[in-house]
């Protein structure tokens, strides 16, 4: 696919050394949309005046004035065009009577061309001007079935007679060429200078045309003052990126949840969740949408059977509506969900030829189920929608009731904003409000995830961005020099990262990179380095396997492995600082600084603009065994593995391995910290042995196997996405916490509450968790357990919140308020568990955590799960704990209380003393 447009351009321009354009005719600028159209002739103002495209099995060449088709000076190009359009050698060439002089040009070159009133069989090439209104359907089907169409005309005069607001939809030529993504506009084309391009010219970011989408927005939102999208589903955000696409519903941050587009002769309306297409409260909008999609026609509205609740909404307002298992040709409008791409091609042709498509869906669930896969490329809805200039993002949007966007809000458009941004970077008259700048940053990063290979419109925008960013350079951003998230610098950071991830050579973007963290004496190894990684992953989650290598900023590494490994679902990851800082107000680094690549071939070049440690990601359940991986272009990083790395080897690494980040590893935990911190660590063995002791305790309490199926990870970063630390894989912490996790003496004397708290989060399980009450409570059981059983630090000393006076104060305060469940959280909630532990020990917890791993069909609500815990714990300790939990305000169900009534009363219930005191 990558060479289709390039090869076509080469064929069209073969032997063309100049554009000998007649001076008299005034051309119209052409507007290109979709994924097939590309420019052929562009003037020095960047206006497209000749374009080519394809539709179905056929091809089109569109010329911006019919006079060009009769000009002998353009004969070399016209002959190339006819040759490229010809479906097979010797196919007939027909010329409409309106272009009779073209026959002579073609015949003089030895081509058999004849004047014909319309194209016929067998399929060949047909040449016509853009003013014929009687052959529209014939010409579309001619191209769709494999014919080649050469068409020329200008629309500015037609616009002067019929109005500029009708050009795109009603100008005769556009009724044909628009199916292939090419439109004649009412804008004059400049005739001063034309350059013969050596490669496919760039498509303009923003083209002026008379038709105003504000009229469409007004029609779609008529009679509506607010859009209440609280329909039970969590919507995705939408990306509006096509020249003829526009937003309809926006939240205060310009995040889009309803959008629409013109495409070809048809129209599309997109909702960010399918629930929006069935909710009665959305009825007025849905009626407007279907009527707008129908374009005044009275045809049938088809509703896919998966969206059957929409039918009554439409039928009760007099719309002819039927349930349909599939799209069929006799429909005027079709309504469906965005979760299957089986009919993608048919839907795209349906819209292109005049149909209306109402479609809805979210992409966040697909993204969660397909880690490592890009929703912009692989989500079925986007396979349908991308060509329309609309996409569904994996990012969610908080449902609410939003006022209809103001005209100013509705005027935001990714392409227009990018055009303004370009002007600003070029020190021209550009202006973007901060809200638009912040939105551009997010939209740009998302747009760059759409696969550009073989799509001229996307390739063109990538080229434009490369030029913009090379000209502006990358800003120096650091903790000492942060940038605001709504600044031009932040937008540059996000766009550069997205561009690099899309395949752009990082070295082009990284020149003069202001965030170099490496020693200037570091250079990639000229010799390949082979490391053996463990390809066995018995766990339920993907596992990062360290290579001990680092890729420098802006560099490429060549990774090679065996054919067996290339078919095993492995990925290469550059960088471990996986927190996405897109929502942060200030940035001390780029928002995204890691990148993953599938190793689905034996050799692959990988890169990341910001550099990073290299990992191989082994998918869950992998039984691959030892895998040799050869990497060229990386540098060794400090890496110490407990039980494998000798002290001498570590000392040598500290002298020779100068990469900015290194790792300390056991089979159960891996710590990623700056090399500067590691240089002070004379011998990593004692601290790692302590970590392994603590990890064994973590596993013991959780009733999980030890060694861990997948080592936990703690990664330090200059900035993280939430809190002082946060859980996950990896656990993230600030640089200030590094000393806390690698200094054995401090850990033994002062404790290490925060990291164990986060490890506790990673052990929490849905069955015995009651969010939001216990989210920040039960994780602390691990902190208490590790401090007491491994570090020998009593709970009262391990954290100030667990001193006896503090604990007593909290209990009294909670009971004094009537023990409201809404206040039972964090330390108050932990107290409940500590009282149980102090009475019955740790064993019931360990036993229950093990038992819960075997349970299925657990209650889905908090009340059900809390009652199950009461029942299970009571049975485990053979005491009726109902009064104890009731004292804490738990919602005990009668059947649970009755089932435990035969158990002995818990005489030592620690809550009794407080309850008696209150009486």
From Swiss-Prot:
SMART domains: M60-like. InterPro entries: Class_I_gatase-like, M60-like_N, Pep_M60_3, Peptidase_M60_dom, TCAF. One of its GO terms (biological process) is negative regulation of anion channel activity. GO terms for molecular function: transmembrane transporter binding. Residues 542-841 form the Peptidase M60 domain. Keywords: Cell membrane, Membrane, Transport. The keyword Transport applies. This is TRPM8 channel-associated factor 2.
């Amino acid at each position: 696919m990558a060479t289709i447009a390039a090869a076509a351009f080469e064929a069209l321009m073969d032997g063309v050394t100049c554009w000998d354009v007649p001076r008299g005719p005034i051309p119209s600028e052409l507007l290109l949309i979709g994924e097939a159209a590309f420019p052929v002739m562009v003037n020095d103002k960047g206006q497209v005046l000749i374009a080519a495209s394809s539709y179905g099995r056929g091809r089109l060449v569109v010329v911006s004035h019919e006079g060009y088709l009769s000009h002998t000076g353009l004969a070399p190009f016209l002959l190339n065009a006819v040759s490229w359009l010809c479906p097979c050698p010797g196919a007939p060439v027909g010329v409409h009577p309106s272009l009779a002089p073209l026959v002579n040009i073609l015949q003089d070159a030895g081509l058999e061309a004849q004047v014909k009133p319309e194209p016929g069989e067998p399929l060949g090439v047909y040449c016509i001007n853009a003013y014929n209104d009687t052959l529209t359907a014939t010409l579309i089907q001619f191209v769709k079935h494999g014919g080649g169409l050469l068409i020329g005309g200008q629309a500015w005069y037609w616009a002067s007679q019929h109005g500029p607001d009708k050009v795109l939809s009603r100008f005769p030529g556009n009724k044909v060429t628009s199916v292939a993504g090419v439109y004649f506009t009412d804008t004059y084309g400049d005739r001063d200078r034309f350059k013969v391009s050596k490669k496919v010219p760039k498509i303009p970011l923003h083209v002026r045309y008379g038709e105003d989408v504000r009229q469409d927005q007004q029609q779609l939102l008529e009679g509506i003052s607010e859009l209440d999208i609280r329909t039970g589903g969590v919507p995705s955000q939408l990306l509006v990126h096509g020249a003829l696409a526009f937003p309809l519903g926006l939240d205060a941050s310009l995040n889009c949840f309803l959008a629409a587009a013109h495409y070809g002769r048809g129209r599309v309306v997109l909702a960010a969740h399918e629930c929006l297409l069935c909710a009665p409260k959305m009825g007025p909008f849905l009626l407007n949408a279907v009527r707008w999609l129908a374009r005044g026609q009275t045809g049938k509205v088809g509703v896919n059977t998966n969206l059957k609740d929409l039918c009554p909404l439409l039928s009760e307002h007099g719309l002819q509506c039927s349930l349909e298992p599939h799209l069929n040709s006799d429909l005027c409008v079709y309504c469906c969900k965005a979760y299957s791409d089986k009919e993608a091609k048919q839907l795209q042709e349906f819209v292109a030829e005049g149909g209306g498509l109402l479609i809805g869906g979210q992409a966040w669930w697909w993204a969660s189920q397909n880690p490592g896969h890009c929703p912009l490329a692989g989500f079925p809805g986007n396979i349908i929608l991308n060509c329309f200039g609309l996409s569904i993002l994996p990012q969610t949007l908080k449902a609410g009731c939003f006022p209809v966007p103001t005209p100013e809000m509705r005027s935001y458009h990714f392409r227009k904003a990018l055009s303004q941004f370009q002007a600003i970077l070029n020190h021209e008259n550009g202006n973007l409000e901060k809200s638009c700048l912040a939105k551009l940053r997010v939209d740009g990063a998302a747009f760059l995830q759409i696969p550009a290979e073989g799509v001229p419109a996307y390739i063109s925008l990538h080229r434009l961005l490369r030029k913009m960013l090379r000209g502006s350079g990358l800003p120096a951003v650091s903790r000492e020099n942060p940038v605001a998230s709504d600044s031009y610098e932040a937008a540059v950071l996000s766009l550069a990262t997205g561009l690099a991830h899309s395949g752009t050579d990082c070295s082009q973007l990284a020149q003069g990179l202001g965030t170099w963290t490496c020693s200037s004496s570091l250079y990639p190894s000229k010799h390949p380095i082979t490391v053996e990684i463990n390809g066995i992953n018995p766990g339920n989650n993907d596992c990062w396997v360290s290579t001990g290598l680092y890729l420098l900023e802006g560099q490429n590494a060549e990774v090679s492995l065996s054919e067996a490994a290339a078919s095993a679902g492995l990925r290469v990851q550059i960088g471990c600082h996986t927190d996405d800082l897109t929502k942060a107000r200030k940035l001390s680094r780029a928002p995204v600084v890691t990148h993953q690549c599938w190793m689905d071939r034996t050799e692959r070049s990988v890169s990341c603009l910001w550099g990073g440690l290299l990992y191989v990601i082994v998918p869950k359940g992998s039984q691959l065994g030892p895998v040799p991986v050869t990497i060229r272009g990386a540098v060794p990083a400090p890496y110490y593995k407990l039980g494998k790395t000798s002290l001498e080897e570590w000392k040598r690494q500290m002298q020779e391995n100068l990469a900015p980040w290194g790792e300390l590893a056991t089979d159960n935990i891996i710590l990623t910290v700056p090399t500067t911190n590691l240089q002070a660590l004379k011998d990593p063995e004692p601290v790692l042995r302590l970590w392994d002791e603590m990890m064994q305790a973590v596993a013991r309490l959780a009733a999980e196997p030890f060694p861990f199926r997948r080592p936990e990870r703690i990664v330090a970063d200059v900035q993280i996405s939430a809190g002082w630390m946060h859980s996950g894989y990896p656990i993230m912490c600030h640089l200030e916490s590094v000393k806390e996790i690698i200094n054995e003496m401090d850990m033994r004397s002062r404790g290490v509450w925060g990291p164990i708290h986060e490890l506790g989060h990673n052990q929490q399980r849905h069955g015995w968790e009651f969010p939001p009450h216990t989210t920040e409570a039960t994780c602390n059981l691990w902190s208490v357990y590790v401090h007491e059983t491994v570090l020998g630090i009593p709970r009262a000393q391990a954290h100030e919140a667990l001193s006896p006076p503090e604990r007593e104060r909290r209990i009294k305060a909670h009971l004094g308020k009537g023990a409201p469940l809404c206040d039972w959280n964090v330390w108050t909630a932990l107290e409940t568990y500590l009282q149980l532990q102090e009475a019955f020990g740790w064993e019931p917890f360990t036993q229950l955590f093990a038992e819960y791993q075997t349970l299925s069909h657990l209650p889905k609500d908090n009340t059900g799960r809390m009652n199950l815990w009461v029942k299970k714990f009571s049975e485990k300790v053979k005491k009726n704990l109902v009064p104890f939990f009731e004292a804490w305000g738990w919602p005990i169900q009668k059947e649970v209380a009755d089932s435990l009534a035969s158990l002995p009363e818990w005489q030592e219930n620690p809550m009794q003393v407080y309850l008696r005191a209150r009486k």
